[in-house]
């Protein structure tokens, strides 16, 4: 009896998670989508309406630029910082790590927007993609640096020591030994950074004023009519397109690395 109740509870929980996904998959192809699940007349008209909206198309391009740039910069910076904190011993290292994790967890979200707005305005970076990328990188760097530090800690130092004995410089050790061994961890944080940047709404909504610079997370508001009522067909189609880059990136990285956290010795 207990097993049957557990099975029913798990099925109900699975259905609760599956229904929104099923709606997202079916609603874009429905001529007149509702909040329920139905697919009476399959059509591509909703996608046609999305690509006719210049703000929506520009938003997708902006999101790709912002997310890719942030992913590349933050991944490299987090890896190099993690390697330094993992391998180098210097005074105050633990204090710096503690302050970074404290600030990244306490000063975030809405509480950080007012000082960020004032800072970007004083630097002349308000309403610019460069300023937004810098904010993204600064916000995502501490957490991903800690993830990478744990990964670098698991890599045996003997590889680097052997390279130094063979005459390699510290820079060569970093580029030829450390970075290749860190690739699985870098892939993991790259996906995390891309997803966080791609899905962020609050930061670009506040720091960007020009509609032509808005990412897709903000541009979706163009599918609300004059009185604020959502146009379900277009929103569903846009949301479907919006998920494709993230899912594609996850599949590529998962097939190549499998999100296995290993160091120098593969398991």
Predicted feature descriptions by range:
Residues 1-267:
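A hydrophobic, multi-pass inner-membrane permease signature
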């Amino acid at each position: 009896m207990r097993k049957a109740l557990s099975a029913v509870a798990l099925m109900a929980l699975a259905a609760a998670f599956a229904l929104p996904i099923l709606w997202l998959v079916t609603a874009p192809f429905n001529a007149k989508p509702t909040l329920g699940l139905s697919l009476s007349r399959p059509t591509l008209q909703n996608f046609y309406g999305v690509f006719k909206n210049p703000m929506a198309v520009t938003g997708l391009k902006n999101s790709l630029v912002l997310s890719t740039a942030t992913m590349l910069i933050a991944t490299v910076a987090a890896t190099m910082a993690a390697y330094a904190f993992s391998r180098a011993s210097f005074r105050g290292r633990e204090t710096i790590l503690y302050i970074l994790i404290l600030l990244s967890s306490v000063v975030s979200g809405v509480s950080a927007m007012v000082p960020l707005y004032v800072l970007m305005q004083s630097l002349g970076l308000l309403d610019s993609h460069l300023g937004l990328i810098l904010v993204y990188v600064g916000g995502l760097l501490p957490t991903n640096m800690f993830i990478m530090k744990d990964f670098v800690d698991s890599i045996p130092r003997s590889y680097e020591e052997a390279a130094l004995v063979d005459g390699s410089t510290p820079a060569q050790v970093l580029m030829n030994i450390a970075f290749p061994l860190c690739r699985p961890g870098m892939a993991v944080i790259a996906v995390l950074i891309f997803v966080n940047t791609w899905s962020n709404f609050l930061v670009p909504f506040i720091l960007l004023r020009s509609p032509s610079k808005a990412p897709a997370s903000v541009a979706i508001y163009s599918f609300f009519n004059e009185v604020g009522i959502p146009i379900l067909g277009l929103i569903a189609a846009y949301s479907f397109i919006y998920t494709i880059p993230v899912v594609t990136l996850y599949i590529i990285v998962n097939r190549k690395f499998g999100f296995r956290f290993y160091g120098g010795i593969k398991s």
